[in-house]
Amino acid sequence: MEEFENFFSQLIPAPDQDIWLLAAQQTPQNNDGVSTSGIPIGWSLQNLAASTNNIAAIDSNPQIREQLQQLQQQQQQQQTQIQQQLQSYQQQQQQHYQQRQQQYQQQYQQPYTTPSPPDQIDYNQQLSPQQQQQQQQQQQQQQQQQQQQPQLQQQNNTISQQQQQQNLNFQVQFLQQQQQHQQQLQQQQEQFQHQQLQHQQQQYFIKQQLQQQQQQQQQQQQQQQQQQQQQQQQQQQQQQQQQQQNQHLSPILSPLPPIQQLQQYQQQQQQQQQQQQQQQQQQQQQQPQQQSINIGSSNTPLQHQAMLQAQSLMDSINTKQPPIPPTLQSPTQHQFLNTPVLDQHILSSIRPSYSQVTKANISTLPTEITNSLTNFNGTNNSTPNFEDLTGGKLSSNNIKNTATPLSSPPSTKNGKQKQPKNNNNNNNSSNNNNNNNQTTTQQKQSKNNNSYGNNSNNNNNNNNFNNNKLKKQNDSTTTPTITSPNMTSPIDSNGDFDLLDEDEKKKSISRINQNLASRNYRQRRKEYIKEIESKMAALTFENHQLKKENESLKETGGVEVMRPEPELITMVVEGKQIIIQLSQALKKNDDRSLIYLLHLYHCAIAKRYSIVEREVEKIVHPYTQSKLAAMGYIPKSDKMFLNCIAGPAADSWFQLFKNEAEITLEQSNKLEALRTQHGKIDSALLQERQELDLDIKKFYYTKILVLPNNPLIIGDIPAQPYNGELSQSPISNSPLEISQLLDFAGKLESLKKNFILHRNLMLDTLASLSSILTPRQEAMLLVRVHFYTSYDFSHMELLKDVWTNIVSSKSITGPLNISEALKKLSDTTNTHHSIENIVKPPQFHQYTPKQLKFENQSNNFGNNNGSKSKNIENNLNNSVNNNNNNNNNNNNNNNNNNNNNNNNNNNNNNNNNSNSNNNNNVNSNSSNVNSNNNNFNNAPQMVLNPPSADAIPYPSTTQLDKRFQWVSYPSAPPPN
């Protein structure tokens, strides 16, 4: 007991001592360089101290911290476990001690006393025999304990060694983890440095690109500045030249009247403003700061002068005082009034109030201004050279007529004036004429005061006429020259104006009004045409969208629903290929290949459940059901899909098959039970389907298809198969309730389940045959019957043809005509088929639409069957043509239980009459004959080669017989 306590007390560390340093204490070493405790020399306290330093460096990593915390928690858990073990051991020892005391009391009936030390024992005392026995037992126990002590010591040593090894392994793992963390940190540092280098390189490249872009922008800015400086220099030179010319011409020239100036320079102002706006936009994109500086420095003096001149003009007009005469003005004012650049600024400053001033103040102009206007018209026979709106110079008549007297009229040619050749001569002549003009103006002012009213009206008319001509000449001619009738108007020798006659005035006024009216009419006509074109474009777009929607509805509404799934066709073709190989294996008696081929056949048809569900979803769709109800289609009793197994028609045939396949009594009993069970379930499903179809038709005819041509109102054919039940249901136009819609949806869902159950019943019956028959018997059944893979697509194709003819026809057909066509189709599908038609041989071509005629001609099953199928198809096509072309005159004659359709259309002269062997007269249009020939010529090639003679189950004996024969059945009904 004490030894165990000492051992465990050594294992428990002190609170200030780390448990991991116990195993690292220095121990005496052997010659091999390994310590007695099993720790190598390399693991010393120094290495551990270095590792702790590394740990302190790694403490910054949160992952390592979490791991260290986990390790500490594990250490604490181990300590608690050891303490719990010690406590449990002590408790066990105490319990064992108490049990021994109780045993002692029971045996000796005395309380247990602790033994005295060996010195106090009296050896001379005589012991009783019981005591002697006890002593002997104690001695034996002591001997046993002494013998067990080395074993316990060995166990303790082994336990201590194991713990030491565990501690060492844990330390090694811990150090390895530290090294791994250090390596990961180094790798992360290297990756981070590599990313920094990449980032620095990218920044360096970006800086270089930015510097290059900045240099390019600076170069562009410098080029633009140079261009602007050149333009400014050119403008300054032009202004200086104009000022020099105006200084020479200022004493000669008198200023134009303000109204005429405003009218002439209005267009010039608009064009220049547009140019300035374009330049400002370009400069704002490139140099927004330089723009403000250059514009402010170049235009401030001009704007100041323009504002002063505008104020003087406005004051003179409002106060009805004449402006300062040009002779009293300063040279700067002469320059201001005569330079076109300054006139532009005047117009720009007074442009907003121009229309108001002209309307309000023309009638109240002072007499002095009117006199100046009349004097200007009389004396100013020449105009100075000044810049036009577009920048060109106008020629002056005065310069040209310097050698002639003042009374002579100016010479013009085609309304255009010639520019002078010598500017020096022009300047001299203008100076000479200026003095004469100044003397005559003052004398004529007093004369013209009385004639202010007449002259003002004439001047206004002339100014309007001049402005219209100026606009036309600016639009039509490329040269910037402008001529006015004031300059070319005839004048007297005294310089007076010859007044226009009243007729000429009326003509000029009417001409101006006509021009304005025609211009307004042209503008309104253009706007109206644009509106009509936009409306037409919107209507064409809408019409195009409606056409697309109608085409998509036609495709998804009827034609595609009638077409079988491509997956179904591929499954049928695969089944046909496998059955051809089964027939070959039967001839060769190869049982192994039969089993393999049957397995392939069942795998190929394993997809039938999903395909059936998709086909049923198409048929049960509410849109398809509404189409069928609108057409008046009624589902007849379905032809038995498994007529070869179930039904009374298969009794005789099935008995022959049993004899040929050597079916046992047990197999025949199972087959008969399967047939009866199939018939019961099939009849129950058919009855349920008829009830559901009746309810759905009632819902459509009473709630949705409430039309004038409703079959219930007219008493049409669709109510007859239901025994008049549909006609008894009331018709209502009230809106549908939610309960009615839910009930209708539930009926559609139950119809879908009925279809799926019926199809799965057929397919499950086929699968259950394989569990009853042997592989050879099943192969014989599939090859002889081949009912599943000989899926007859003729009825589906005929339905598709009927629907496509209805959709593609131009004339509108009602649901009554469609119902008649479909009734005939349903009558043909319900004919009683013989066993020869049911038991078909395998077809050796892939199914494609529009191939029925080629199929009937290529497979020689008898002339009667071929002519019968042709008659049925031609009758259906002719019935559709009759319903489309002759809605009013439909004459149907029935002869020899066959439909003979006669086209009574006066416009169609292409009627082909053909007499069959069974006295069946079938008339078809030329379009139908051509379609038959085209289908025969353009038939697709066969996918599979025809089988060899060995593969045929019953080879023909003669050429006139059928290619594939079956045993003649005496009880089979004759073909119709």
UniProtKB/Swiss-Prot annotation:
Residues 505-507 are annotated as: Basic motif. GO terms for cellular component: nucleus. It is found in: Nucleus. Residues 374-385, 393-411 have a biased composition (Polar residues). Residues 509-516 are annotated as: Leucine-zipper. The keyword DNA-binding applies. Residues 104-128, 374-499, 855-957 are annotated as: Disordered. Keywords: Coiled coil, DNA-binding, Nucleus, Transcription, Transcription regulation. Residues 57-110, 136-287 form a coiled coil. SMART domains: BRLZ. Residues 504-567 form the bZIP domain. One of its GO terms (biological process) is regulation of gene expression. The keyword Nucleus applies. GO terms for molecular function: DNA-binding transcription factor activity; sequence-specific DNA binding. Probable transcriptional regulator. PANTHER family: CREB/ATF BZIP TRANSCRIPTION FACTOR (PTHR14312), GLYCOSYLTRANSFERASE-RELATED (PTHR14312:SF2). This is Probable basic-leucine zipper transcription factor Q. The gene is bzpQ.
